[in-house]
């Protein structure tokens, strides 16, 4: 339980006492009562809306309830002061012992500090990246990979049982384009001059694949019609691309639990089973769709089609699952894939898509709702575009890929840790500027450096203390008593609450934002110590005070390390 949850329980207990004293009526609904940090830190350590929430159902003025609550809460030893503000908000200021207790908890729990049980072991499938197996991952895939991986780690820390999954789109026409492109590189490996036409993949990454194919089959396919080699090369080319993609993911430290092939859905009865499930629920019918306004989607045709009643589950229009010629639409295997997820017993599904898939969200949610009977929620997180630049110059091309900057290019330029952290400095659905020069600056304007610098500074102080024969000792925590020090401890106390909020909203960027704020508070206290010597973490003439202050900064380092672990970033001990 977080400290904020503990204080909320204290507020609820005080309300129960007021009910028992007949100050408040019984049967009041408490769910909307909150305890959280005030918007203005000068107002106190925590604020509660209890009086505002209870006023109407109790038939009382908010301030009257607030004053009665304040009198009860003032008796709690953990609370120094209770102030009634505005129409009836309560601002609480906690005792120094509470904040020193937070420091002690962080030291005791170490890597476990901030871990939560709110997930209660629920099984969550997080599908992310899922790029077509046609080439190396590009900078847009990088954002989805980082976001999805950090989200999976966040949910794990919050007590969920997480499966990380990659859906291999190896059943569509784009793989045929890959095969034809590989064939051209294969001919090139045999010494032929080839021309890459529009619609093929010209990147240098296929040169080695063409050579590998030559080594495998010799000249068996040279100058043969594609009916002789298209199917034969398809599996080979897909495997080669997935090996490349796995290597790209490894550069970022991303490891998947499951790679699921779209092709495995065809010819196995899985698509038919999913559609039959919907048919059995009365959600499949034969009919016509009105032509859509604007651009005509690929799955629309002016003929009778097999349609899914997705409008009964929140979609704007019903969706085709089978064309008039009897072939499946693109949507059908996606339905089957999510039917498989539901059948595997997951309690919640999360899909991480690029922003260009925004139009797919409602139909996918409708499908999962129908397939699970509304029991399995699907949250679709869209990652917006990344604009890669070097100063004023936008970086668009990569010789390796032929048309785009790759994940490997980005990691080579700035490193995996910088890449991962910076990809989380904006909410996933906001566009992101990624300046490869800016992210290497050593300044407060570079969040990843600023957070890492805080951790390195702390480790430097701890090494100095160790050389002097001193170490953190919670028995001396009374030395942490200055308001600036206690404010830093209060920031540490926010971390467990932050984890729960971020996990409930599937928002790992909140962790990055919090770490920057924590680092800023730490650096601010460090700078204060330059002028006010009693705030310095290393007190040459007072070993006991030093050991107490070392506890404070050790707790900060623990939180930074734990938070960076969620983001997939390695904390540095020196810079």
Curated annotation (Swiss-Prot):
> What SUPFAM superfamilies does the annotation carry?
Anticodon-binding domain of a subclass of class I aminoacyl-tRNA synthetases (SSF47323), Arginyl-tRNA synthetase (ArgRS), N-terminal 'additional' domain (SSF55190), Nucleotidylyl transferase (SSF52374)
What would be one Pfam family of this protein?
DALR_1
Keywords annotated in UniProt: Aminoacyl-tRNA synthetase, ATP-binding, Cytoplasm, Ligase, Nucleotide-binding, Protein biosynthesis
State the Gene Ontology terms under molecular function: arginine-tRNA ligase activity; ATP binding
- Transport recorded as keyword: no
Stated EC number for the protein is 6.1.1.19
Aminoacyl-tRNA synthetase is among the record's keywords: yes
**Broad EC category:** ligase
Which superkingdom, per the lineage?
A: Bacteria
Q: Which GO terms describe its biological process?
A: arginyl-tRNA aminoacylation
The record's listing under CDD domains reads: ArgRS_core
Fill in the subunit field for this protein: Monomer.
- What protein family is recorded? Belongs to the class-I aminoacyl-tRNA synthetase family.
State the protein's name. Arginine--tRNA ligase
Query: Which gene produces this protein?
Result: argS
């Amino acid at each position: 339980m977080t400290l904020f949850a503990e204080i909320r329980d204290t507020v609820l207990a005080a309300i129960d006492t007021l009910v028992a004293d007949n100050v408040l009526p019984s049967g009041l609904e408490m769910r909307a009562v909150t305890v959280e940090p005030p918007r203005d830190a000068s107002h106190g350590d925590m604020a509660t809306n209890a009086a505002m929430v209870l006023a109407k159902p109790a038939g009382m003025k908010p301030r009257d309830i607030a004053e009665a609550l304040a009198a009860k809460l003032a008796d709690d030893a953990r609370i120094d002061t209770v102030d009634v503000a505005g129409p009836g908000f309560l601002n609480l200021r906690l005792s120094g012992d509470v904040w020193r207790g937070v420091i002690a908890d962080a030291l005791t729990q170490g890597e476990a500090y901030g871990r939560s049980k709110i997930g209660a072991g629920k099984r969550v499938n997080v599908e992310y990246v899922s790029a077509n197996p046609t080439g190396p991952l590009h900078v847009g895939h990088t954002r989805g990979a980082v976001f999805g991986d950090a989200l999976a780690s966040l949910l794990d820390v919050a007590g969920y049982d997480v499966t990380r999954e990659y859906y291999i789109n190896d059943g569509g026409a784009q793989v045929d384009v890959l095969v034809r492109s590989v064939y051209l590189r294969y001919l090139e490996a045999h010494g032929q001059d080839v021309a890459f036409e529009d619609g093929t993949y010209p990147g240098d990454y296929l040169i080695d694949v063409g050579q590998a194919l030559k080594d495998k089959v010799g000249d068996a396919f040279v100058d043969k019609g594609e009916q002789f080699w298209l199917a034969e090369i398809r599996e080979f080319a897909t495997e080669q691309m997935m090996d490349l993609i796995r290597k790209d993911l490894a550069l970022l430290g991303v490891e998947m639990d499951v790679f699921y092939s779209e092709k495995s859905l065809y010819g196995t009865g899985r698509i038919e089973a999913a559609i039959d499930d919907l048919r059995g629920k009365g959600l499949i019918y034969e009919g016509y769709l009105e032509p859509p306004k604007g651009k005509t989607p690929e799955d629309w045709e002016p003929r009778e089609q097999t349609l899914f009643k997705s409008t009964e589950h929140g979609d704007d229009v019903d969706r085709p699952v089978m064309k008039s010629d009897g072939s499946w639409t693109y949507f059908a295997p996606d339905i089957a894939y999510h039917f498989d997820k539901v059948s595997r017993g997951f309690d919640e599904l999360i899909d991480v898509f690029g922003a260009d898939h925004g139009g797919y969200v409602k139909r996918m949610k409708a499908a999962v709702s129908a397939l699970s009977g509304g029991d399995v929620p699907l949250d679709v997180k869209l990652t917006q575009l990344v604009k890669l630049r070097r100063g004023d110059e936008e970086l668009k091309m990569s010789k390796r890929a032929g048309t785009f900057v790759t994940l490997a290019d980005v990691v080579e330029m700035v490193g995996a840790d910088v890449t991962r952290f910076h990809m989380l400095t904006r909410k996933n659905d906001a566009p992101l500027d990624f300046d490869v020069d800016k992210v290497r600056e050593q300044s407060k304007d570079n969040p990843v450096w600023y957070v890492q610098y805080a951790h390195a500074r702390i480790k430097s102080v701890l090494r100095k203390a160790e050389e002097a024969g001193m170490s953190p000792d919670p028995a001396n925590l009374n030395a942490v008593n200055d308001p600036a020090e206690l404010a830093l401890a209060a920031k540490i106390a926010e971390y467990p609450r932050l984890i729960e909020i971020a996990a409930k909203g599937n928002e790992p960027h909140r962790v990055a934002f919090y770490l920057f704020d924590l680092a800023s508070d730490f650096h601010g206290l460090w700078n204060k110590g330059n002028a006010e010597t009693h705030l310095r973490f290393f007190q040459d003439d007072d070993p006991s005070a030093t050991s107490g202050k070392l506890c404070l900064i050790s707790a900060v380092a623990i939180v930074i390390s734990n938070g960076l672990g969620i983001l997939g970033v390695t904390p540095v001990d020196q810079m």
